């Protein structure tokens, strides 16, 4: 395994509590005396400077510095690796992030930056679960996408214990090594790959719902009842249920966020292999619209929308309306109903369901067409 050139670290608060908070201003050791004074004065650059005079393996330096020192010593990362610190949405998190970036810039790392994880805090457990862990997954996935999985490693030593579980799943999904150092360990350890694989076909089937929740944050559960029923237990792993003013909403779970971020990018790079062949231009046909009330009221807008789908997605041959509902708005998305690819159009109060005829001939190809349609939809929202 080649050493990582980009290291993504979760950040906790052990540097402050109990380490620096436990120092005494009258400590006879001059370094600890400086540290105590700088910490009490909240002079974070001075804290970084004082820490730099200590061995990085000393416990006073905190979990992040200790673990990175072990990573570098064992050759798991290059000496001047890019460093990204994912810290909590708290005052202490921001302050420790500032100390760490100042410390490692002094040490010669060309990139040492922080990423605040919105919602990652311990004052609101519900927000921690529904926002914080999801946002951690989102930030780490984007860093790995920016720098490439072959260049990255995750250091999951610092922070809340739940972050370790998220980090391990991220590493499994992204193909990135994950490291952890307990305070009683002499050295850092790597988590072995798990003997399971995430299912890209499950993501393609449910890509519409996952993309919707990623974009909107929370969506009323009633508007997605059919999709939840079709998804069964697999889909339940990807979503959290949240009550807002007495109404149930759906949001992506941390696992759902990881699966969606991972497979969306994988699909975009492998779509030519997964999708059926394009339809010839001569075989594409105009949309067929029924004569029902909702369709009649929105006929021209519907015609333009269905024509744009046929023109914009190479594998689509034509679209035709199936049924409409004047009372139940549904989110715009594409899904599989049996062997039929279906989409939904809505103006926010009325909905029309339409079928999409494509060049797909197998279940896997139909699932890939659903993913391509939802990707097209996200680009045109």
PLM segments and residue spans:
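Long, low-complexity, Lys/Arg-enriched
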Residues: 1-151, 165-381
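Conformationally flexible catalytic loops at phosphate/diphosphate-handling active centers
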Residues: 154
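Glycine-rich beta-strand-to-loop/alpha-helix junction loops that act as flexible
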Residues: 157-158
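Polyanion-engaging groove/track-forming segments
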Residues: 161
């Amino acid at each position: 395994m080649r050493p990582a050139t980009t290291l993504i670290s979760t950040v906790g608060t052990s540097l402050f509590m109990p380490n620096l908070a436990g120092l005494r201003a009258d400590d006879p050791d001059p370094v600890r005396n400086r540290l105590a004074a700088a910490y009490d004065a909240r002079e974070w650059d001075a804290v970084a400077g004082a820490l730099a005079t200590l061995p990085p393996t000393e416990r006073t330096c905190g979990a992040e510095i200790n673990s990175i020192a072990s990573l570098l010593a064992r050759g798991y990362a290059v000496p001047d690796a890019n460093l990204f610190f994912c810290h909590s949405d708290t005052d202490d998190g921001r302050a420790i992030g500032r100390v760490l970036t100042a410390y490692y810039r002094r040490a010669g790392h060309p990139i040492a930056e922080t990423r605040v994880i919105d919602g990652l805090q311990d004052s609101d457990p519900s927000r921690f679960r529904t926002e914080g862990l999801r946002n951690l997954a989102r930030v780490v996935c984007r860093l790995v996408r920016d720098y490439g999985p072959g260049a990255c490693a995750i250091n999951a030593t610092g922070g809340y214990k739940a972050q370790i579980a998220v980090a391990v799943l991220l590493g499994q999904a992204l193909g990135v090594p994950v490291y952890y150092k307990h305070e009683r360990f002499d050295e850092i350890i790597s988590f072995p790959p798990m003997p399971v694989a995430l299912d890209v076909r499950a993501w393609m089937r449910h890509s519409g719902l996952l993309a919707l929740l990623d974009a909107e944050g929370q969506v009323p559960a009633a508007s997605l009842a059919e999709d939840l029923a079709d998804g069964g237990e697999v889909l339940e792993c990807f979503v959290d249920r949240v009550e807002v003013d007495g109404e149930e909403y759906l949001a992506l779970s941390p696992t759902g966020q990881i699966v969606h971020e991972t497979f969306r990018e994988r699909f975009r790079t492998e779509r030519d292999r997964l999708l059926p062949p394009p339809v010839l231009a001569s075989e594409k046909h105009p949309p067929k619209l029924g004569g029902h009330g909702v369709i009649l009221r929105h006929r021209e807008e519907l015609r333009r929308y269905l024509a744009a789908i046929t023109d914009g997605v190479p594998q689509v041959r034509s679209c035709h309306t199936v049924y409409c509902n004047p009372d139940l708005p549904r989110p715009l998305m594409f899904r599989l109903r049996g062997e039929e690819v279906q989409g939904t159009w809505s103006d926010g109060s009325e909905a029309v369901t339409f079928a999409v005829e494509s060049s797909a001939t197998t279940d896997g190809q139909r699932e890939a067409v659903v993913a391509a349609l939802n990707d097209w939809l996200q680009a045109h929202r």
